[in-house]
Curated annotation (Swiss-Prot):
Protein name per UniProt: Trihelix transcription factor ASIL2
Disruption phenotype: No visible phenotype under normal growth conditions.
Basic and acidic residues bias (residue ranges): 333-350
GO molecular function, one term: transcription cis-regulatory region binding
Comp. bias intervals (Low complexity): 271-286, 428-443
Record has DNA-binding as a keyword: yes
Gene Ontology CC terms: nucleus
Sequence ranges of Gly residues compositional bias: 64-78, 239-249
Pfam families assigned: Myb_DNA-bind_4
Organism: Arabidopsis thaliana
Major subcellular site: nucleus
Length: 443
């Protein structure tokens, strides 16, 4: 299937025989109920013995000159609707390659494949069913396989490829793919390094990376990192012209003392012409680094070597006449005392900080103890108040009960007196009535 599609993509040089027969042949369409039975008979008797021969002769003859097929649609040089022509494949490769480069030679996503399918289907001379993103992706895979086959054939000595899309794919995914160059200057140690495309083989990528790293690194970067200053020594300072001592200009770092800057190079200028040769550049740089390190050690030793006046005077005698005068002894002693005081001050600061922390801890502890005592006192007061409240409540309850009982007793007594009075009054009334009746009877 892949070979068939690759053959169709090369053009109309080898069309599909099943879809469009070549010129010179005649295509005959026969409609019959069943497969006819043919027999080997002479040409003269074929019309008499075979009744289907007349029907074959009367049917219309169709040539293969790009006419219509059995369904009435134009063939257009192809039989299948999903076959790819050379023009469609070219448009597909261009659209895919553009997005492939935009993604830094990465894989396309579904939206990119849909855009590619729309571009392929929107051609002016396109009259078939629109291509889908899946068809475009499968076609690209087929073209890549064809490209790999061509590469293998060329590697085996097959000569230059005649495939029309070979050069285009070789520029996109081959080893000859162009790498974007730097458009701006070097901005740092690795500022000129750019992203290397992943389509390049691993060996080429590593070599290119090392070349760019070497080109982006300044020549004196390592030396500057070692001595902390710019140390560019011209070759003329060590030239073997045989002249006087110290011929040539030297750019010495300003961090080196004047005596060290003057004496070593004067000695070097006097000794090298006697030898009659020049040192290599690497050896010169090594000597320069050594002198700078010795000068730094000398400066550090000079700063700390002020224990006695004799040592300070010896250090002062080592200086040359063109150096600056050393500071007075009293000033140096004051500086050392100030440094010691500064050191003591740092220790005092730490001690003061420790004391402040201790004082803060003590104050915090006292505050917590006071809070705890206050809570205990408040709890005692609360218990005392509750006890007094309960006592008052009991007293009030007892007093209330006593008053209620007294009221009940008084009410009972009052009710008894009332009943006695009523009985006596009734009795008196009866006696009065009886007396009245007796009086009436007597009258």
């Amino acid at each position: 299937m892949e070979d068939d599609e690759d053959i169709r993509s090369q053009g109309s040089d080898s069309p599909d025989p099943s879809s469009s027969p070549p010129a010179g042949r005649i295509t005959v369409t026969v409609a019959s109920a069943g497969p006819p039975s043919y027999s080997l008979t002479p040409p003269g008797n074929s019309s008499q013995k075979d009744p289907d021969a007349l029907a074959l002769a009367l049917l219309p003859i169709q040539a293969s000159g790009g006419g219509n097929n059995s369904s009435g649609r134009p063939t257009g040089g192809g039989g299948r609707e999903d076959c790819w022509s050379e023009a469609a494949t070219a448009v597909l490769i261009d659209a895919w390659g553009e997005r492939y480069l935009e993604l830094s030679r990465g894989n396309l996503k579904q939206k990119h494949w849909k855009e590619v399918a729309e571009i392929v289907s929107s051609r002016e001379d396109y009259g078939k069913i629109p291509k889908t993103d899946i068809q475009c992706k499968n076609r690209i895979d087929t073209v890549k396989k064809k490209y790999k086959q061509e590469k293998v054939r060329i590697a085996n000595g097959g000569g230059r490829s005649r495939w029309v899309f070979f050069d285009k794919l070789d520029r996109l995914i081959g080893s000859t793919a162009k790498i974007p160059t730097a458009t701006s200057g070097v901005s740092g140690p690795v500022g000129g390094l750019h992203k290397i495309p992943m389509g390049i083989p691993m060996g080429s990528r590593s070599n290119l990376y090392h070349q760019q790293a070497k080109a982006a690194t300044p020549p004196f970067n390592n030396l500057d990192r070692l001595i902390g200053a710019t140390a560019r020594v011209s070759a003329a300072s060590f030239g073997g012209s045989g002249g006087g001592g110290g011929g040539g200009s030297v750019n010495v770092p300003m961090g080196i003392p004047m005596s060290s800057r003057s004496a070593p190079f004067g000695q070097q200028g006097r000794t090298l012409p006697q030898q009659g040769r020049t040192l290599p550049q690497q050896q010169q740089q090594g000597m320069m680094v050594k002198r700078c390190s010795e000068s730094k050690r000398w400066r550090f030793r000079k700063r700390n070597a002020s224990d006695s006046d004799s040592e300070s005077e010896a250090a002062m005698s080592d200086d040359s006449g063109d150096s600056l005068p050393p500071p007075p002894l009293s000033k140096r002693m004051k500086t050392e005392e100030k440094k010691k005081q500064d050191g003591d001050g740092v220790g005092n600061k730490w001690r003061e900080l420790t004391r402040a922390i201790m004082r803060f801890g003590e104050a915090y502890e006292q505050t917590e103890n006071a809070k705890l005592q206050q809570v205990v006192e408040m709890e005692k007061e609360r218990m005392k108040f509750l006890k007094e409240l309960e006592l008052q409540r009991m007293q009030f309850f007892v007093k209330t009960q006593l008053e209620i009982s007294q009221l009940k007793q008084q009410h009972g007594r009052r009710m008894g007196n009332t009943s006695n009075d009523h009985h006596h009054s009734r009795k008196n009334n009866i006696n009065a009535i009886v007396n009245n009746n007796n009086d009436l009877g007597n009258n």
